[in-house]
């Protein structure tokens, strides 16, 4: 028992440090709890707006000068913060009066999963700053995003899918947001202990997965097997994924699969391998009975 405790202790200290940095960052200069955000006066309970945040790779460092000619976009925590805030603000102003707003992080919000500057599986990556500072700045960013959505929607649901870059960090992120908004009844943070998350709203079933190491057919079978009640109760069935950094859509059986694009610039490795896609963020509006109603897309250069 003593040996096991010694092995686990550094990990526990690391998690406590991350939690402390995020809470400190959220409370430094943001006033969400001291001055609660006022709910909108008029909303339409027939509609839900889902903000699709593709792989954001917060904490990644990309220098345009080191990449393929024409692919010269830089990326660091300041740029990542500015672009995501601007895109979310623009989407919030255009999605209408939907009662519920869902902030969906499709996974890989963080570029690295530990202070070793590696992904969850240990792949080295280029980072902008220390993991503790990255986590602190992420806390500030998420509070700003959620508070903006609280101005537009009566209720905000936060979903953090666990990616292949940030499986552990995504769990810490959800725990911190849940603690911070524990007294705010208008915010609901879904648990992300599993890589599969689902959310049922009236006649709509939403399933979320990062999309790594899992084919659509496998996801469909897992949903039918494990969510049979929710499946039978919902006419409109959607699976939202990230991972591939560009938008694709497919209808398999009676379920719609979509991988969502990303606002992120390419890093030097992906650029050298010829990868790249349109950089965008989309919000989809759903009707409680008939499913998807409309969508708005914001593109960045």
Predicted regions mapped to residue ranges:
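Non-catalytic propeptide/linker segments at domain boundaries
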Residues: 1-44
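Generic structural motif
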Residues: 6-12, 56, 204, 287-289, ...
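A generic short-segment signal for beta-strand/edge and adjacent turn/coil regions
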Residues: 15-22, 71-75, 126-129, 166-168, ...
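Short, motif-level signal for alpha-helix interfacial/capping segments enriched in acidic residues
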Residues: 31-41, 87, 219-232
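Core catalytic region of metal-dependent phosphoesterases/phosphodiesterases
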Residues: 37-56, 66-174, 179-185
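Glycine-rich active-site/cofactor-binding loop and its immediate structural neighborhood
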Residues: 60-61
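Conserved beta-sheet core of the metallophosphoesterase superfamily
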Residues: 150, 177-195, 200-300
């Amino acid at each position: 028992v003593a040996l096991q405790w010694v092995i686990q202790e550094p990990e526990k200290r690391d998690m406590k440090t991350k939690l402390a940095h995020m809470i400190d960052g959220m409370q430094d200069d943001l006033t969400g709890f001291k001055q609660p955000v006022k709910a909108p006066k008029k909303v339409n309970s027939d509609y839900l707006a889902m903000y699709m945040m593709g792989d954001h790779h917060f904490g990644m460092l990309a220098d345009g000068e080191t990449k393929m000619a024409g692919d010269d976009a830089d990326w660091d925590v300041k740029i990542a913060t500015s672009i995501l805030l601007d895109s979310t603000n623009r989407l919030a102003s255009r999605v209408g009066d939907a009662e519920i707003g869902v902030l969906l992080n499709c996974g890989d919000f963080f570029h690295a999963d530990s202070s070793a500057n590696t992904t969850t599986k240990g792949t080295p990556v280029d980072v902008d700053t220390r993991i503790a500072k990255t986590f602190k700045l992420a806390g500030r960013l998420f509070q700003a995003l959620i508070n903006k959505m609280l101005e537009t929607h009566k209720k905000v649901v936060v979903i953090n899918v666990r990616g292949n870059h940030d499986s552990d960090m995504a769990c810490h992120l959800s725990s911190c947001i849940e603690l911070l908004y524990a007294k705010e009844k208008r915010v609901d943070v879904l648990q992300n202990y599993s890589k599969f998350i689902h959310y049922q709203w009236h006649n709509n079933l939403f399933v979320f997965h990062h999309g790594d190491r899992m084919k659509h057919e496998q996801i469909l079978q897992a949903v039918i097997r494990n969510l049979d009640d929710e499946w039978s109760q919902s006419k409109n069935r959607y699976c939202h994924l990230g991972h591939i950094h560009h938008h694709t859509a497919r209808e398999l059986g009676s379920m719609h699969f979509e991988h969502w694009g990303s606002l992120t610039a390419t890093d030097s490795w992906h650029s050298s391998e010829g990868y790249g896609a349109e950089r965008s963020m989309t919000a989809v509006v759903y009707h409680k009975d008939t499913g998807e109603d409309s969508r708005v897309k914001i593109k960045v250069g």
